[in-house]
Every structure is written in C-alpha cells, then in structure tokens.
Amino acid sequence: MKKLVFTFKRIDHPAQDLAVKFHGFLMEQLDSDYVDYLHQQQTNPYATKVIQGKENTQWVVHLLTDDHEDKVFMTLLQIKEVSLNDLPKLSVEKVEIQELGADKLLEIFNSEENQTYFSIIFETPTGFKSQGSYVIFPSMRLIFQSLMQKYGRLVENQPEIEEDTLDYLSEHSTITNYRLETSYFRVHRQRIPAFRGKLTFKVQGAKTLKAYVKMLLTFGEYSGLGMKTSLGMGGIKLEERKD
C-alpha cells in the first residue's frame, strides 16, 4: 500500500468540497474502462482525503492494492498541476510518498503488543450506514466491522468477515472518552450526516487481541473508516499514547 501526499499552497475553499473535486480530477486521469471497473467494486481499492493547514492544503491518496497501485501510481507521480472546475489552476509544491506493506502489518500482529487504550482522530467527516439508515455516532462494533471488511476484501481477498471475531472484539472493547461533533459531508446535492473529533477506547483481553486491534487501526490510517472513503470521508489517524 502506498500513501501519496500532494501539497499545495493553501486553497481557501471548504475541504469537503475540495475532496469531491479532487476525486473527480483523479477519475479524469484514469482510463475510462478502469473507472467503470472501480464503480462496480464493493470496496474501492483507494481512499482519499483533504487536510487544510494554516499555510497549505494537502490532498492525500492511498493506494490499497498492488493491482490498483500498478495502474495508478505512475499517473499520479506525473501530476504537476491540478484543475478543479471553477477554481484557479493549482500547482503541486511537493509530493511525499509513504508505504505500508503486508509484512509491516503482520509484524504488528505478531508483536508483543500490550497497548490497552487507543485513540482515533477522525480528521474528516466519518459516517456509517446500518440497516439502511445513517449512523452519526460510532460504536465499537461499527468501527471494527468497517475495518475488518476493508482489510478482508483488500488484503486477504475474503469477501465476508468472521462474525465470531467481530463479536469478540466488540464485547472486549469499551469507549472510555470522546469529543465528537456532528458534521455533514456534501456530495453534489446530498448532505450526508457524519461526525468528526476524537474517540478513545479500551481493549481488555490477551496481547494477541490488542495486537490485532493495533494492526486494524494502522491499516485504517490508509483505508479510511466507514462509508465513502474514496470521496474523502472517514480519514483517520491514531494518536500516539504512552499508556
């Protein structure tokens, strides 16, 4: 898996709107047959997000499978300027590349991990759909279900998750602290209810369980969490903890 961070001089435009525009730009760079293929996938092999800083704007693209990386990576590296509909042409100031391999994830899983508390920062609006309805407050079950589905489909090529494992994870994890706010993500004319902020939870159980959680969350920093991660929703990062 690769992470590409495109840095621009700060763009004074809402990050959520930019994320959708950048996604449209990305699709324009790809072969139309491949774009059609992507639209048919149950879980997209990429995730994006836009992060606004004080002096710059970053467009982050995660390539989550080897096949998608082979088709997209070199195209992305050649991008020097970006045109987003009604905005002035944007010049790329720099591109940073990071990598997360399956071997690194396996190393985390096999480690003597004994971290009990984990903190997730929801950088972009994050949301779930359950039984046909939007969910604007996270539960541990929804968090783990999303991560396990993405990991299973994109890394292990397994379309279905193990419900027993999901049950066990959910039963042994408890939200201990949160600071969340309602946030809406607009896609064209649709406003999707979601949330942003920070959540801390505790995992009780064997070291193997805690290591599995750490592996899933590390993967989640690339895959995103919840729905519409290819459009810019569900961008997360882990907060480093000492306990």
From Swiss-Prot:
Q: Which UniProt keywords apply?
A: Antiviral defense, Endonuclease, Hydrolase, Nuclease, RNA-binding
E.C. designation(s): 3.1.-.-
In terms of superkingdom, the source organism counts as Bacteria
Q: Which GO terms describe its molecular function?
A: endonuclease activity; RNA binding
- Which spans of this chain does the record mark as coiled coil? none
User: Broadest EC class?
Assistant: hydrolase
The record's section on InterPro entries has: CRISPR-assoc_Cas6_C (IPR019267), CRISPR-assoc_prot_Cas6 (IPR010156)
Is the Glycoprotein keyword given for this protein?
no
| Any one biological process term the GO annotation gives | defense response to virus
| Subunit annotation | Part of the Csm effector complex that includes at least Cas10(1), Csm2(3), Csm3(5), Csm4(1); the presence of Csm5 and Cas6 may depend on the processing state of precursor crRNA. Csm with a precursor crRNA does not include Csm5, while Cas6, the enzyme probably involved in pre-crRNA processing, is found associated with a subset of the Csm complex that is probably in the process of pre-crRNA maturation. The Csm complex is elongated and slightly twisted with a maximal length of 215 Angstroms and a diameter of 75-80 Angstroms.
Q: Write out the similarity annotation.
A: Belongs to the CRISPR-associated endoribonuclease Cas6 family.
A further note on this protein reads:
Encoded in a type III-A CRISPR locus.
Q: What does this protein do?
A: CRISPR (clustered regularly interspaced short palindromic repeat) is an adaptive immune system that provides protection against mobile genetic elements (viruses, transposable elements and conjugative plasmids). CRISPR clusters contain spacers, sequences complementary to antecedent mobile elements, and target invading nucleic acids. CRISPR clusters are transcribed and processed into CRISPR RNA (crRNA). Csm functions as a non-specific ssDNase. Base-pairing between crRNA and target RNA to form a ternary Csm complex activates a ssDNase activity; target RNA cleavage suppresses the ssDNase, a temporal control that prevents uncontrolled DNA degradation. Viral RNA transcripts probably tether the Csm complex to the viral genome, recruiting Cas10 ssDNA activity which is able to degrade DNA in the transcription bubble, spatially controlling the DNase activity.
In Swiss-Prot or TrEMBL terms, this protein is called: CRISPR-associated endoribonuclease Cas6
Q: What is the lineage of its organism?
A: Bacteria, Bacillati, Bacillota, Bacilli, Lactobacillales
